[in-house]
């Protein structure tokens, strides 16, 4: 019989231990890969959900804007009676049209228009500027070209730096939006703004 070789037995044990460690590491690697794959799948699903929610939010906002615009136009096209007292103004009345919420409706113009019926908001706007043209203290603040526009019921032109694209004239702004039940013909809810300021107001600036 051959003598037992203790070194050979130790070598086999070492090989078996190495194989076990290798298998264990492979198992760990496989589990890590599965975990990473699951994590990526969750991340992708979260991203897809977030994108879907954002698209839904944009769609809802778009639908709300469209509804508000339709509601606003509907109310502006309805007849109504002018209300409100306006505010006293000075000789630089429209200097405030380019800042904050704009310039107020002059009280003496409000006195002329109060309780009068208008076919729609365009009708009110024309009558408003016509009354401004008839007021000596207010009309003298405008150049000849704008005086002519006022007499025709047209809004005066703003300075070039206060215009935006084709919007070149002063505009009437509802301080409390019509879509939030702001009074269409409430002169205390109306401000005169430059086109640029009007756009900034509606952007929340």
Curated annotation (Swiss-Prot):
GO terms for biological process: defense response to bacterium; killing of cells of another organism. SUPFAM superfamilies: Colicin E3 receptor domain, His-Me finger endonucleases. Residues 53-76, 88-99, 159-178 have a biased composition (Basic and acidic residues). Residues 24-109, 136-187 are annotated as: Disordered. This plasmid-coded bactericidal protein is an endonuclease active on both single- and double-stranded DNA but with undefined specificity. Colicins are polypeptide toxins produced by and active against E.coli and closely related bacteria. Belongs to the colicin/pyosin nuclease family. This is Colicin-E8. It comes from Escherichia coli.
